[in-house]
């Protein structure tokens, strides 16, 4: 029977499927961080258990770490407790830890792939909703809750219902300057923030195949923002080229065998999806959100929506509420919207390709008066590479702040947060009310769009001179 990519990975990981019950699937990689793991480790201790497969568990510190200092003294009391607790738990249970002093420390969804921990055909879980990022490699990756984190620690398995399948095809090629972030925001704009609910989405089409691994990770990262359980892209030569030689990638004869196996990880001809969506790549312009969820998005040359144009009262009410919160007027040109904060970073857009794209717009320019802009590399390796290329100097010469790796301003959990009334051009993944700080307004954009907004002081169409 013809199978989709998701069905192939799922079927190969089902341990047992009792009649009338959710199947139990095997987990190949378990990623943990300081925020969602303490209670799970405690549960394992109380039960008198050990970790089932500590060698398949990888930990880092990212959500609550400081991006201005690697010292524990820079952390709040709560953050310090979380960081120190993770260190103690990893030592006690034999888990590999990339702490704040490790050269490879970084955002879990950045450092996992760059170390080769993420591999095609595997099942990967983490106590973080953006675990879908790893699906860019043809892995089945999704976020889990703290009780499930404990279950995986104890058994290396998870009870899961099988999801429905959705194909999202982006046909043709994008215009010059259009990025993976624009593609995925356009997708969410088309199907809505709940259009993928109940599905595992496979992204395909010429525009997806043309993306680098960094770009594919951006797309899969935001699968959760369309409501999907996970997002996947079939592995190909681009995938193998990225993974070859990385620390945890197969070596020698095992590498050849792995690549041969990965070549089979594609949806069979004739496989049937439960739902399908098609976009024409050439129609995608630079995107940015205007409201309070990722589905409230428009192209840079479009206007802030008018509630009176809504198709029903529910949509009208949603638009009205969002406009009130973000303090925008219907009919406003997005290029007339000013910003005072810029954040370039997060597990969506903090890789070397993202920083290079942003640096193009920062080079030889200055951050506009009244704007604070920070650049936060996603990992120690990204930071090292960027500095070797001189990107840090381009940013600092332009007036951007160059920071240490971490989740930073993506969420109002650490010291990098917005104040009430701030309006931020952000390369992160969520623009919910208060996401970056109580009373703050977030506009999701690509790294290039964020850097351009920083120097202009307002959103600009990067396809035109500014």
Curated annotation (Swiss-Prot):
GO biological process, alphabetically ordered: L-leucine biosynthetic process
UniProt keywords, alphabetically: 4Fe-4S, Amino-acid biosynthesis, Branched-chain amino acid biosynthesis, Iron, Iron-sulfur, Leucine biosynthesis, Lyase, Metal-binding
Residue positions binding [4Fe-4S] cluster: 347, 407, 410
Known EC number: 4.2.1.33
Pfam families: Aconitase
Domain of life assignment: Bacteria
GO MF, one annotated term: 3-isopropylmalate dehydratase activity
Catalytic activity: (2R,3S)-3-isopropylmalate = (2S)-2-isopropylmalate
Required co-factors: [4Fe-4S] cluster
Pathway: Amino-acid biosynthesis; L-leucine biosynthesis; L-leucine from 3-methyl-2-oxobutanoate: step 2/4
Details of cofactor binding: Binds 1 [4Fe-4S] cluster per subunit.
InterPro entries xref list: 3-IsopropMal_deHydase_lsu, Acnase/IPM_dHydase_lsu_aba_1/3, Acoase/IPM_deHydtase_lsu_aba, Aconitase_4Fe-4S_BS, Aconitase_4Fe-4S_dom, IPM_dehydratase_rel_enz, IPMI_cat
Function (record text): Catalyzes the isomerization between 2-isopropylmalate and 3-isopropylmalate, via the formation of 2-isopropylmaleate.
Subunit structure: Heterodimer of LeuC and LeuD.
Family statement drawn from the similarity comment of this UniProt entry: Belongs to the aconitase/IPM isomerase family. LeuC type 1 subfamily.
Protein name: 3-isopropylmalate dehydratase large subunit
Source species: Shewanella pealeana (strain ATCC 700345 / ANG-SQ1)
Designated gene of the protein: leuC
């Amino acid at each position: 029977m013809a199978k989709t990519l998701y069905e192939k990975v799922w079927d190969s990981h089902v341990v047992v499927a009792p009649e009338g019950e959710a199947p139990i699937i095997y987990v190949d990689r378990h990623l943990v961080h300081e925020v969602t793991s303490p209670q799970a480790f405690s549960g394992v201790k109380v039960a008198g258990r050990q970790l089932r497969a500590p060698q398949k568990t990888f930990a880092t510190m990212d959500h609550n770490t400081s991006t201005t200092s690697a010292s524990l003294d820079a952390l709040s009391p709560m953050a310090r407790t979380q960081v120190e607790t993770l260190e103690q738990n990893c030592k006690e249970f034999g888990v590999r830890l990339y702490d704040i002093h490790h050269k490879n420390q970084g955002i879990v969804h950045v450092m996992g792939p760059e170390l080769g921990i993420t591999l095609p055909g595997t099942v990967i879980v983490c106590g973080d909703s953006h675990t879908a990022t790893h699906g860019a490699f043809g892995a089945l990756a999704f976020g889990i809750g703290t009780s499930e984190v404990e279950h995986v620690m104890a058994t290396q398995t998870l009870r899961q219902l099988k999801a429905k399948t959705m194909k999202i095809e982006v046909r043709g090629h994008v215009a010059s300057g259009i990025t993976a972030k624009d593609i995925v925001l356009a997708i969410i704009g088309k199907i809505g923030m709940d259009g993928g609910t109940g599905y595992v989405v496979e992204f395909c089409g010429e525009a997806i195949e043309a993306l680098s691994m960094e770009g594919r990770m951006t797309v899969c990262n935001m699968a959760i923002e369309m409501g999907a359980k996970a997002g996947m892209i079939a592995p190909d030569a681009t995938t193998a080229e990225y993974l070859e030689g990385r620390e945890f990638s197969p070596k020698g004869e095992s590498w050849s065998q792995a690549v041969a196996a990965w070549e089979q990880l594609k949806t069979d001809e004739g496989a049937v999806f439960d739902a399908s969506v098609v976009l024409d790549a050439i129609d995608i312009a630079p995107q940015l959100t205007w409201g309070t969820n990722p589905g409230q998005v428009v192209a840079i040359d479009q206007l802030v929506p008018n509630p009176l144009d809504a198709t029903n009262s529910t949509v009208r009410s949603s638009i009205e509420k969002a406009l009130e919160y973000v303090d925008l007027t219907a009919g406003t040109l997005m290029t007339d919207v000013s910003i005072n904060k810029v954040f370039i970073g997060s597990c969506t857009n903090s890789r070397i390709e993202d920083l290079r794209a942003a640096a193009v717009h920062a080079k030889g320019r200055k951050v506009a008066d009244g704007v604070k802009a920070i650049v936060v590399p996603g990992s120690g390796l990204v930071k090292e590479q960027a500095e070797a290329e001189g990107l840090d100097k381009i940013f600092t010469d332009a007036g951007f702040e160059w920071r240490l790796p971490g989740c930073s301003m993506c969420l109002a959990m650490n010291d990098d947060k917005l104040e009430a009334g701030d309006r931020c051009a952000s390369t992160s993944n969520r623009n919910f009310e208060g996401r970056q700080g109580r009373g703050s307004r977030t506009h999701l954009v690509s790294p290039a769009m964020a850097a351009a907004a920083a120097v202009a002081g307002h959103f600009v169409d990067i396809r035109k001179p500014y």
